[in-house]
Amino acid sequence: MKNSFFSKFTPKEPKFFPLLKQLSDVLSASSVLLVESMEHDLPTERADYYKQIKDMEREGDRLTHLIFDELSTTFITPFDREDIHDLASCMDDVIDGINSSAKRIVIYNPRPISESGKELSRLIHEEAINIGKAMDELETFRKNPKPLRDYCTQLHDIENQADDVYELFITKLFEEEKDCIELIKIKEIMHELEKTTDAAEHVRENIKKPDRKVFIKAEQDTWNY
């Protein structure tokens, strides 16, 4: 009993980094499935990919809740517990967005996915890759923050690309699509994909929080000196 009590006050930093990395791995795997699903037009094939993505989404939920549980029972965390909470939650939101996009494709069963839709899925995958790389740097960013900051910059650039792809496509969609039902289907799917790229941007914002706080603390220490 004594050991159990005092263990809460013992540094347990390492466990959060592997859990966050595992969550980013699930995100990356989900994004790969999304990209692959865009190349298939048969309803049965789309449904099969959605099932696989749904399994990934459930695993993402499991890891996210595990991180939350660990936060509630750990006294010392590697950085602010609310930042760990928000980072995990935002990564889970991206996985949820991928799942929602795949779900809409199955439900609406649109014509072959446009090149713009495929491009958005590829950009989501690029965001997932950069998030995974950022998670690799999270444990050591205090010693060398540059790689983490570089990945955050790349995430921001990718999200801007996604905005451009989405806005151009929607403009053309309303100009050229004459089938109102098909227009609604495609717009819903594209909107969900674009929302998912936005969710990845929120991950970037939460990755930056610990770095920003460390920087401010260093500046304050300099002033105090």
Q: Residues of each region from the PLM?
A:
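Cytosolic, long alpha-helical scaffolding segments
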Residues: 1-225
